[in-house]
Curated annotation (Swiss-Prot):
SUPFAM superfamilies: Scorpion toxin-like. InterPro entries: LCN-type_CS_alpha_beta_dom, Scorpion_toxin-like_sf, Scorpion_toxinL, Scorpion_toxinL/defensin. Residues 1-19 form the signal peptide. The lineage of its organism: Eukaryota, Metazoa, Ecdysozoa, Arthropoda, Chelicerata. Keywords: Disulfide bond, Ion channel impairing toxin, Neurotoxin, Secreted, Signal, Toxin, Voltage-gated sodium channel impairing toxin. It comes from the Eukaryota. Coiled coil: none annotated. Sodium channel inhibitor. Possesses potent toxicity in mice but induces only paralysis in cotton bollworm. This is BmKBT-like peptide. Disulfide bonds join C31-C80, C35-C54, C41-C61, C45-C63. The keyword Ribosomal protein does not apply. It is found in: Secreted. Expressed by the venom gland.
Amino acid sequence: MKAALLLVISTLMLIGVLTKKSGYPIQHDGCKNWCVFNHFCENICETYGGSGYCYFWKLACWCDNIHNWVPTWSRETNKCRAK
């Protein structure tokens, strides 16, 4: 039974179901989450199943080990229109 469970978990990891990613999670308008203090980002990243901090030089939340379904910011798909 343990071998079967191990096989299922290994298979799921290989097909990417249990994989995680890192990046700047975006808001509904496509912009990064603005921050100055770490505790704000820690709460956001925990919501997405990971951990994170405020990347001070960019004033944006960076998250590690968040779920793959979480939309993250990228330069190629940037839809944020800063006001």
